[in-house]
Structure formats: structure tokens, C-alpha cells
Curated annotation (Swiss-Prot):
Superkingdom of origin: Eukaryota
Annotated function: Usually encoded in the trnK tRNA gene intron. Probably assists in splicing its own and other chloroplast group II introns.
Stretches assigned to coiled coil: none
Annotated organism of origin: Spirodela intermedia (Intermediate duckweed)
Subcellular location: Plastid, Chloroplast
Family, as annotated: Belongs to the intron maturase 2 family. MatK subfamily.
GO cellular component, one term: chloroplast
Gene Ontology BP terms: mRNA processing; RNA splicing; tRNA processing
Keywords, comma-separated and alphabetical: Chloroplast, mRNA processing, Plastid, RNA-binding, tRNA processing
GO MF entry, a single one: RNA binding
Signal peptide (residue range): none
Protein known as: Maturase K
Amino acid sequence: MEEFKGYLQKGGFKQQHFLYPLLFQEYIYVLAHDHGLNVNASTLNEPSEISGYDNKSSLLLVKRLITRIYQQNSLIHSVNDSNQNRFVGHNNNFYYKMISEGFAIVVEIPFSLRLISSLKEKKEIPKSQNLRSIHSIFSFLEDKFAHLNYVSDILIPYPVHLEILVQILQCWIQDVPSLHLLRFLFHEYHNGNNCITPKKSSYGFSKDNPRLYRFLYNSYVVECESIFVFLRKSSSYLQSTSFGTLLERTYFYGKIKHIGVTHSNDFQKTLWLFKDPFMHYVRYQGKSIMASKGTHLLMKKWKSYFVNLWQCHFHFWSQPSRIHINQFSHFSFYFLGYLSSVPINRSSVKSQMLENSFLIDTVTKKFETMVSIIPMIGSLSKAKFCNLSGNPISKPVWADLSDSDIIDRFGRICRNLSHYYSGSSKKQSLYRIKYILRLSCARTLARKHKSTVRAFLQRLGSEFLEEFFMEEEKVLSLMLPRTSYSLHKLYREPIWYLDIIRINDLVNHL
């Protein structure tokens, strides 16, 4: 990041109003690739005088690429020129990819510098490495959700038009040429098909340049969640430290001020309704959970407020059906690969005082997490480990590997899933997943050696079972001291790890 500051000072483009000239700086593309552009001048149909810029970042080359992008429409109609037709047919995606990679670096610079300056203002930066773990979210839910009544399962609304993404950046970056270039790249090259679409998950990105689309989607989510910055300064113990630095509040507060002028009395009443000390909000990627100890009417007001705010003031299309309100005692919500619920457990205790005895009915609530076996089987079937019925099948694409590599790959997948699903309250579904992977491994090895599964399992013996079933027990035996509480009973309890920073690919397929 210090390199970014040096480059900005060197080029004299320290303010975010002058980002467009950075697109013509060679070091931007070096930073984007960590090496040269690896551009072959012959594929660009460039004249011989610039052929010396092969495998280098060239100001002249970038200028010509941007010029050709803007001239795309005229080149499409020039069907008589074979070289121009070649540009339209073959090099079109290459030009977009090259310029967009540089653009992704440029738009990140102001936000990166703002984050660095905000961290330097704090004398002590809190050490929150453990809070980065995905499992830390569940430990928070386990502590808080058992005392709440209602939960809203929210899918972040998707923009129906790419112009929305440009308008969001316009609130933060006042460099008009850069925004025009981004708008042109969107509409002329992607036509909205590779961006965030209703047919895909709300966090789907284009594969051409994931860095740029990750930045655009994060900007979009920050805009959606800006409602919480206005209504609540803090909503949980796991609040994000970088959220405030990445959010430009000027544009949002301008809208809220306009609302307050026109509907000041009603707006104050609305704010009073949402002052709920027991409201908790958690989000990961495109899905969020909002829970409250309030009434069902309060949750309906929140739902109405979200829909109206997104549609009327942020111009986001948000169907009310994407927000589901349910009572904890009768509902299980799917979040981060776990099926979570807060069931009510009723029990009766007989109490006796002197000669009188009576029954006391007690009600307890406990946050429970389980592995949803049906979606997991669907994910395993997509990865070709089993069929849709859950019957294990062989993995033909791995049959050419050595036996040790095959066992190691299956074992690694099994260990990763066991590690991620260690917080499950009931392990039966996890055991079934292990069984599918173990038998799929055996079928793959039997297919390779042209043998039967039964004969192969007999030849491998019990060591083959330990590779898939005993790894988690070995880890726990090293981590936890010997106590009177048996290890078998301990393994049945939910265990949350603080070293999981990403979801397993099989879980992420869901």
C-alpha cells in the first residue's frame, strides 16, 4: 500500500477526482499482474515501430487499446477490413480484460489509502484474528439467538441494471472519465450477462476479472447496509472495523436529510420504532440474518422499511418474497452450510416441600446446528462423488493418479468437511458424508485396479477406515487434556474452530 501512495505522489494524482490519468501509467498494470503485460504486439495488429513493447507495459499500447474500445461500434460495421474483423472476433475480450484489470487497481487506491489513514489514527489496533473465523459467527449466534423470538432470512437484492453499480461508485469517486469508461465497458462488452443476475447467486462475479467485480459487489453491499449505519451505531460485538472507513456517508445522509425535511414527524416516529436493543444482524456474502426479541409486528415493519428504502431511495429492486419472517421455535434457517434452529425443550421437575409435592414445568431454548444432508448430497453429486440418491460412485478423472494421491485427496476433503462441520449438534449426517466419500474412494481405487470394492476393502483393512473417521478424534486428543469427561461424549458436542477463514468448496456449491 505504501507503493500506491508513492505512485500517487509521483504522478500528482493524490485526489480521487483524478483517477483516470492513472490508467495510462505503466506501473498500474505491473501491479495488476506483478509482471509485464505479456502482450504480443503481433496479435494486436500493431505496426512494427512498437513491437519493442512486447512483454512490457506501454503507455502507447494502453492508449490504443482504449481508443479501440471506444471505436468498437464503427469497427463492427467495417466488414471489409480483415484486420478489424479480427479485432472484433478474437481480441475483443482481451482488450476488455486488460483495461478492466488496470481499472480495478485504480479504483481501489482511494479506499485503500483511506483505510490506512483510519488505522493510523487509532493508537492501538485491536487484535481480532480469531474473529475472522467463520465459526466465530456461530459462537456469536449460539450466545445470542437462544434468547430471541423471531428471525428474518434475507437475500441481498440484486441490481437489475448495471447503471446502479456505476451510480454507487459515483457517490465515492467523482472522476467522470473513469465512470464513463466503466459504463462503456459494462454495456458494450458484457451486456449484463456476466454480472450479478437473478439467475445466479447474488454474489456471483464475472470470471474475466473477479477483482473488479468483487470490488463492485462489496460497494453495492455497503450501500445496502448503510441503513444500519444510520439507525444503529453498533449492533453486535462482532462489528466490522473497516466498514465505516469504506462507507461514504455524505450521499446517504443527504437522502435521509431530504426524507426528514418532507416527513420529519413521521420519520422520528419510525426511528423510535426501530430502537430495539435486542436486534442482531449477521451477513455472509449474499445472505443475511436479522433476529429480534420483539414482536412479529416489529419484524414486519423492518421488512417493509427495507423494501421501501431499497426501492424508493436507493433504486434497488427488492421483492418482498426475498425476506422471510419466522418464529425461532418453528423454523430452521440455512446459513453458511448449517441448518440452524432454536427449539423449545419442555421438561417437568417434581418438587416436594414437607408433605406437599408439585410439578414444575420448565422451558429451555438451545441453539442447535445440523448438517443439511439433502443439499450436501446434491453438492457431492455435482462433484461426481455420488448420484442424486446419495449412492457413492467412482471418480474416473482421478483414476490415473497413484493410490496414495487418490487416498490423500479423498482424505483431505473428508478432513476439511469434518473440520468445518465440527459445530454440528448431531453428527449422523456428517457420518453419512464420510461414508459416501470413503466408499467413493474405494470405488475409484477398485476401478483403477479393475477389482471389486469388497476385495479392495478387505485388502486395505482398518487403516483405510482410520484415514476417514479418526482424524478429528486425533486432533481433539492432542488439543484437550484428559478429563473424566470421555472423548467420545466430547466429540458429540459442537466444537467451533477459530482458524476457518473460508467455506469449503463443496459447502459453497449449495
